[in-house]
């Protein structure tokens, strides 16, 4: 089968290593972006940036917009616009959202892109050739909002504005009964194969209760074949079915294929025994990040489409929950949508990023409020930024402290602490705290890597907070500023001044190392703020191999200059009444 590309090919730069490939859902352009869209982006972007933090790894992130379908057609008609004009405008809102929040995608895909449209046609013809598509009359309950049919078992009747209407029990959107001739995909042929795959790959869907939900549904309910086209008389804004102008391709059949489009499929994929062999240098298979409301499309339809084509299945599907505002899912009808662009103007981009990642509980719905966001921002300012403020003052020298370590002045630091620490009652506790912090700092990358790669972002950030809190506590307990006073006192003997200088430099050095290492490791979450602090420290090594104690001994020059501004300004709670 010939495959033509009318648009420019995306040049994938991965040659020698297998890149990690992560995707967001492509966002439907019938409305403006909200915090939920940003959340999906940030889950993927954080993991993408984390992978790239390790110079031995490569990563590719895909995001974009879903631009076909009846909802867009209807919205365009109401606005008096051509659908393409509408999607061009709204798609920019999503790319601007990514730009505003430092989401470093490798491709922003649009389902109106030429290479994607060609891929959809190719895939349709492939399924036709394999005998998995047929025509039939279809009747059932159709939701315009969800652009899908629902079985009778998922329909309930409610009263709206004094009138009885049918709705989907899953999405709560209104449905209407329709009968029409469509093309169908033989989902039912692959039900047992998908069940066996899921049983053999229990980590395919994360978290576990989402995996169990899909597996139970497949085991308990016979899959109906899927209607994958709509009459052109009703749906005009979609990709035309090859060789049949009376039908348009169902939006989800079109949309899901975007993940393959970005891989340049089928180019480079060899066919062996009716299956496509993934090239060694291909970014495929993908790790998909999706919201729980589209789990069936990604965990039932999509794997079956790939099975039918003979293509390797995705690596994993990460299903996140929703953000609640005042206990309710954010929605346009409730008027509780949060505009991420607006809140970032007040709180800043990185504090919003950090709040969403720090509270990224994919198992359950997350609670959003500006009070919680303010509290999170204050913690970043008062703990993380406070470290550089403490050691970056005029009484200390980070550069001298780093040089003290390099020259071996801390080789006998335990003995010096035991002998010359002013508060003798706190020596044992201080030594114990120092041992724990140095151990935790050396293991911080491994700990965070474990949690980030398992999409347990909350625990990754907890590990990060732990060393920040320990360093602040040690600085407060050790009181290095008292040694500065003693060093400057004419009454202090020269020998003691030297010991106090070493003690002072050691505590400054340990806090500087905590700041350096923690700043490198928080770059995937707070890229702007971490850059400011690393710039102030004059750190050049900013990748994972520099995230152990003393891995970098060439920083600190100018860090204590009076010219530095605070990395994050304190702000008052916003009056949102």
Swiss-Prot record:
It is found in: Mitochondrion matrix. Keywords: Aminoacyl-tRNA synthetase, ATP-binding, Ligase, Mitochondrion, Nucleotide-binding, Protein biosynthesis. Signal peptide: none annotated. Coiled coil: none annotated. CDD domains: MetRS_core. It holds the Pfam family tRNA-synt_1g. A motif ('KMSKS' region) lies at residues 329-333. A motif ('HIGH' region) lies at residues 25-37. It is an enzyme of class 6 (ligase). GO terms for molecular function: ATP binding; methionine-tRNA ligase activity. Its EC number is 6.1.1.10. It catalyses: tRNA(Met) + L-methionine + ATP = L-methionyl-tRNA(Met) + AMP + diphosphate. ATP binds at residue 332. One of its GO terms (biological process) is methionyl-tRNA aminoacylation. GO terms for cellular component: mitochondrial matrix. PANTHER family: METHIONINE--TRNA LIGASE, MITOCHONDRIAL (PTHR43326:SF1), METHIONYL-TRNA SYNTHETASE (PTHR43326). Belongs to the class-I aminoacyl-tRNA synthetase family. This is Methionine--tRNA ligase, mitochondrial. It comes from Candida albicans.
């Amino acid at each position: 089968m010939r495959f033509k590309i009318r648009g420019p090919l995306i040049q994938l730069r991965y040659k020698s290593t297998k890149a990690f490939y992560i995707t967001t859902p492509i966002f439907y352009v019938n409305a403006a972006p909200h915090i939920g869209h940003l959340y999906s982006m940030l889950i993927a972007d954080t993991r993408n940036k984390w992978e790239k933090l390790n110079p031995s790894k490569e990563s590719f992130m895909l995001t974009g917009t879903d631009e076909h379908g009846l909802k867009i057609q209807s919205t365009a008609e109401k606005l008096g616009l051509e659908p393409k004009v509408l999607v061009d405008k709204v798609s920019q809102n999503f790319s601007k959202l990514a730009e505003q929040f430092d989401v470093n995608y490798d491709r922003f895909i649009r389902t109106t892109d030429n290479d994607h449209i060609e891929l959809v046609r190719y895939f349709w013809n492939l399924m036709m050739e394999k005998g998995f598509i047929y025509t039939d009359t279809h009747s059932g309950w159709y939701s315009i909002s969800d652009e899908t049919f629902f079985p009778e078992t998922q329909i309930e009747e409610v009263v709206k504005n004094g009138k009885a209407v049918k709705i989907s029990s899953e999405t709560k959107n209104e449905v209407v009964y329709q009968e029409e001739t469509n093309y169908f995909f033989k989902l039912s042929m692959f039900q047992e194969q998908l069940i066996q795959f899921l049983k053999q790959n229990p980590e395919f869907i994360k978290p576990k209760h989402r995996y169990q939900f899909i597996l139970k549904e497949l085991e308990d309910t016979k899959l109906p074949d899927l209607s994958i086209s709509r009459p052109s008389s009703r749906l005009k804004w979609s990709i035309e079915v090859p060789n049949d102008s009376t039908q348009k391709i169902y939006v989800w059949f079109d949309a899901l294929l975007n993940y393959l489009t970005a891989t340049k499929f089928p180019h480079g994929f060899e066919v062996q025994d009716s299956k496509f062999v993934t090239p060694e240098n291909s970014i495929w298979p993908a790790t998909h990040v999706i919201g729980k409301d589209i789990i069936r499309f990604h965990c039932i339809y999509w794997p079956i489409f790939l099975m039918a084509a003979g293509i390797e299945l995705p690596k994993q599907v990460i299903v996140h929950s929703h953000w609640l505002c005042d206990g309710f899912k954010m929605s346009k009808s409730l008027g509780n949508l949060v505009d991420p662009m607006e809140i970032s103007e007040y709180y800043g981009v990185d504090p919003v990023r950090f709040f969403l990642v720090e509270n990224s509980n994919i198992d359950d719905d997350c609670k959003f409020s500006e009070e919680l966001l303010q509290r999170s921002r204050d913690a970043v300012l008062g703990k993380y930024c406070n470290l550089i403020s403490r050691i970056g003052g005029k009484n200390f020298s980070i550069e001298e402290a780093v040089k003290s370590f390099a020259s071996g002045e801390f080789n006998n630091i335990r003995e010096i602490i035991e002998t010359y620490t002013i508060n003798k009652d706190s020596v044992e506790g201080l030594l114990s705290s120092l041992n724990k912090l140095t151990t935790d700092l050396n293991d911080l990358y491994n700990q965070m890597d474990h949690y980030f790669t398992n999409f347990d972002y909350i625990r990754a950030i907890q590990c990060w907070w732990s060393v920040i809190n320990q360093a602040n506590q040690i600085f407060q307990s050790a009181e290095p500023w008292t040694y500065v006073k003693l060093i400057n006192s004419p009454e202090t003997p020269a020998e003691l001044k030297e010991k106090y200088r070493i003690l002072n430099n050691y505590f400054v050095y340990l806090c500087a190392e905590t700041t350096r290492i923690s700043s490198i490791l928080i770059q995937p979450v707070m890229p702007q703020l971490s850059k400011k602090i690393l710039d102030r420290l004059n750190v050049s090594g900013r990748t994972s191999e520099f995230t152990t104690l003393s891995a970098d001994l060439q920083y600190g020059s100018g860090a204590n200059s009076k010219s530095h501004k605070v990395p994050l300004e304190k702000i008052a709670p916003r009056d949102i009444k």
